[in-house]
Amino acid sequence: MPQISVVLPVYNVEEYLRQCLDSLANQTFEDFEVICVNDGSGDSSLSILEEYASEDERFKIISQENKGLSGARNTGMDYIKGKYTIFVDSDDWLELNALEKLYNKIIALDSDILMYKFRFFNQDSEQYSESVFTNLEVIDASLENKNFNYRDVSDILFKISHAPFNKLYKTSFLREAGIKFPENLNYEDLYFFYMVFFKTEKVSVFRDESLYNY
């Protein structure tokens, strides 16, 4: 059983997909699987996935008719085998040490959710940037290296990134919570974040460096 399951929805991202897949294939932490959900792509995304899956058995492909981002994530969640789960968007990419850093942190603290820094890449200027929203600096330093819950950050709750991709989740927690992404609903990320956040007493944060690029 892999330690980490990466859920990767894929829909018409041939231009960016190789960069994303390379960032996963070359992780310093190797005990993971990538559940690639081909959500009815009409471009060469599926053939790119098949190329990587033929060379690396950690990449699994599930193809379905288009259900949208939430539907693809939910399908991926049905196939998770790892102890921990991370969501990655297929036009983004991870730093090569991301899974190693996150795994070590969540194991050390035994958290249900580990939130981490991410950054924006401007394709025009080719510059990276962070914001208070992405770097998690709104979370008080007293909560560093410990678990906390939503009550501890209730005054800044709406300033914390609700994106699903900058979090590592304990899979058993997600299953016990029984929460999936709502389909055919706007702001599905927001719904998912608050539903899981309100159900745990064990949230932690990794702010040493940005590990995700979008």
Residue ranges: model-predicted function:
Residues 18-22, 46-50, 82, 95-107, ...:
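Short alpha-helix within the catalytic core of nucleotide-sugar-dependent glycosyltransferases
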Residues 46-81:
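Conserved donor nucleotide-binding strand/loop of the catalytic core
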Residues 69-70, 90-207, 212-214:
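Donor-binding/catalytic cores of nucleotide-activated saccharide
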Residues 1-26:
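N-proximal low-complexity "stem/linker" segments adjacent to membrane-targeting elements
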Residues 23, 38-48, 65:
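A conserved acidic beta->alpha catalytic loop
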Residues 85:
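Short aromatic/hydrophobic "clamp" motif used to bind/position activated sugar donors
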Residues 15-18, 31, 43, 47, ...:
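Residue-level preference for short helical/loop micro-motifs built around acidic side chains
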Residues 31-40, 60-65, 89-90:
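Short beta-strand/loop segment that forms part of the nucleotide-sugar
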